[in-house]
Each structure stands twice: as structure tokens, then as C-alpha cells.
Amino acid sequence: MLKLWLICILTVSVVSIQSLSLLEETNYVSDCLASNNISQAEFQELIDRNSSEEDDLENTDRRYKCFIHCLAEKGNLLDTNGYLDVDKIDQIEPVSDELREILYDCKKIYDEEEDHCEYAFKMVTCLTESFEQSDEVTEAGKNTNKLNE
């Protein structure tokens, strides 16, 4: 579940909501926890989990998937159909070309998903995997440059 928590944090960061404190100030987290029947204790347990635990993302509790959608919705990051709106994100804070490409690539795959909770979760997973791959490519490039020196 720690990976799920990290995915949530990454998503919030990716979609340009600057910090968890901003979410807390606007009560987004509390509101979304309550609307998805997630207790503060469950949320804290999710945060405190050991990072070495393997997560089975396929079996993620629907409440957490809907929690992610709720955060995006309350953050005004969705279009009228409930899908991520890159232009709205860009208005909050300019999006880099790399992030824009990743967002659109994930949207191409998942924007037909009718279940908004599943959509939000799949988008977060796609974004996370894309960033992991991007980081691996960047790291490989750095290592190649060091070898060439």
C-alpha cells in the first residue's frame, strides 16, 4: 500500500498541486477520505507502511481509487466528462514538455474508461510508470556520459 500512497503523492505533485499542505488547507484530503469511507487511522497506516512491502496494485481497494479521483476533482483538474484536463493543469502551473507528453500518452490509453475511479487509478499508475521509465532513461544517460569521460 505504500506504493499506492506514493502514487497518490506523485499524482498530486504531477498535476501541479504544490504540496500536501495545500490539499490539507483546503480540506481536500479530509473531504475525500470521508466521502470514500477511509478513516484517518487507515490513511495514516497507509502512510506509515514499510516501503519494502510489495503492493498488489491490481487488488487495490476501490475506496483508494475513488480517493484519487476525488482529489483530482476537488483540485479542479478534470474536464466536464471527468477526465484529466491538461490545459487546467497548465493554468495552475506551467507543464513541462516531457510531462505534457506523458499526460497525453496516458490520456490516449485511458480517456475512454467509463468508471471514474478506475480511470483515476489507471492514470496515476500510467503516470507513475512513465516517470519511472523516464528516470531510468535519464539515469542510463548519466551513466553513459560518465563512461565516456
From Swiss-Prot:
Q: Which organism is it from?
A: Drosophila melanogaster
Record carries keyword Disulfide bond: yes
What are the protein's UniProt keywords?
Disulfide bond, Olfaction, Sensory transduction, Signal, Transport
A cellular component term from Gene Ontology for this protein is: extracellular region
Give any GO molecular function from the UniProt entry. Answer: odorant binding
**Disulfide bonding pattern of the chain:** C32-C70, C66-C117, C106-C126
- Please report which protein family the annotation says this sequence is part of: Belongs to the PBP/GOBP family.
Q: Which residues form the signal peptide?
A: 1-16
GO terms for biological process? response to odorant; sensory perception of chemical stimulus; sensory perception of smell
Task: Please explain the role this protein plays, according to its UniProt record.
Answer: Present in the aqueous fluid surrounding olfactory sensory dendrites and are thought to aid in the capture and transport of hydrophobic odorants into and through this fluid.
Q: What is this protein called?
A: General odorant-binding protein 57c
Q: Does the keyword Disulfide bond apply?
A: yes
Q: Which domain of life is it from?
A: Eukaryota
Q: Which SMART domains does the annotation name? A: PhBP (SM00708)
The protein's matches in Gene3D superfamilies, at most eight in alphabetical order, are given as: Pheromone/general odorant binding protein domain (1.10.238.20)
